[in-house]
Amino acid sequence: MKIVADENIPFVNELFEPIGEILLRPGREITPADVKNADILLVRSVTPVNAALLEGSKVQFVGTCTIGTDHLDKAYLDERDIAYSSAPGCNAGGVVQYALSAMAVLGLLQDSPSKDFKVAVVGCGNVGSRVYRTLSALGYDCIGVDPFLDTSTIPHLQPFEAIYDCDLICCHTPLTRSGPAPTEHMFNTDVFNHLKSGATLLNAGRGGVIDNRALLQYLNTHNDLTVVLDVWESEPDILVELLDAVALGSTHIAGYSYEGRINGSLMIHRALIDYLLAHGEHPEDTRRAIEAYVAKDKETINVTSFADAVLATYDVRDDDALLRQAVQGLPASFDMLRKQYRKRREFSHYQIEAAPPKLMPLLQSLGYGVVAK
């Protein structure tokens, strides 16, 4: 069995070598010639999977180690009877960490949030709902915006226009161009003009959900909107002038925690195992060894405030600085920063040795451990 895989998929050899012969390629450079004789294709969001790539190939299973699937031509895959699977929610913990870090840097993360501070989470799927639940549990007044859900899933569900009264808007939607509620350029000049003065807009979903040129034009003529962008239109060839105009920018790494990336690999491995079992194969399952390896090490920290606890695990300013320093090398440096991304650990990796007692329940609810006395 032949497998073509993105070289940046964590533990790709350890997980998939027992299943078949692996050819590793840079994600943006996977070609029809690479996949012509492959049975399995494993990708990330940087690889468009469509007729141009797969026509004439033997591929029968496509796995993407990402939550999003807008890079997969699902209609073509269905027509060709090619099975496919994604990793919904795999990086939710990392995205929560990213959002809280940005809030801490901007002075929006408080031990006791003001009741006058209102948050909107736009897109409440696997990741957005985790952000919504986390901020709500931390005491923030949160609303959810998602036309495909009802209040049984998100209690305070509101129409899109409700974001105009919010102080922080966190965007976690997929990119869609058709259907009953397309998200492409959902945030445009008209929306910017209606946002609350002094609001903060954070996008860790898909770049095209925000009209980047319209946003740049707005920021060049207004000083009442703070913007945090982890995702951009036309990645990796991003609008450099927009980077100059936003408060914080990064290279599509919000969910790029060590645990999140490994979760994506493990979920696709499980999906492939299930597919092969259903087709009479009996592949070796190596997930347990990987899971045990990830879980065994912990790091101890001391904190004095909630913001301090978050920034001790991850400071988004580090990634912002790396992107700004690499701006002359764009677009290649955008991908290089992602490829060489450090081992960023989620809250569950850390154990609190000392912290104000009132913070301990809050920190434990986020997954921090506590050093036994």
Swiss-Prot record:
Root EC class: oxidoreductase
UniProt keyword Nucleotide-binding present: no
Assembly with partners or alone: Homodimer.
Name recorded for this polypeptide: Erythronate-4-phosphate dehydrogenase
Subcellular location: Cytoplasm
Catalysis performed (reactions): 4-phospho-D-erythronate + NAD(+) = (R)-3-hydroxy-2-oxo-4-phosphooxybutanoate + NADH + H(+)
Active site, renumbered: R206, E235, H252 (proton donor)
GO BP annotation list: 'de novo' pyridoxal 5'-phosphate biosynthetic process; pyridoxine biosynthetic process
Function: Catalyzes the oxidation of erythronate-4-phosphate to 3-hydroxy-2-oxo-4-phosphonooxybutanoate.
Organism for this UniProt entry: Saccharophagus degradans (strain 2-40 / ATCC 43961 / DSM 17024)
GO molecular function, one term: protein dimerization activity
Family: Belongs to the D-isomer specific 2-hydroxyacid dehydrogenase family. PdxB subfamily.
A Pfam family annotated for this UniProt entry: DUF3410
GO cellular component, one term: cytosol
Residue sites binding NAD(+) per the record: D146, T173, D230, G255
Pathway this chain belongs to: Cofactor biosynthesis; pyridoxine 5'-phosphate biosynthesis; pyridoxine 5'-phosphate from D-erythrose 4-phosphate: step 2/5
InterPro entries named among the record's database cross-references: D-isomer_2_OHA_DH_cat_dom, D-isomer_DH_NAD-bd, Erythronate-4-P_DHase, Erythronate-4-P_DHase_dimer, NAD(P)-bd_dom_sf, PdxB_dimer_sf
Residues involved in substrate binding: S45, T66, Y256
Keywords annotated in UniProt: Cytoplasm, NAD, Oxidoreductase, Pyridoxine biosynthesis
Enzyme Commission (EC) number: 1.1.1.290
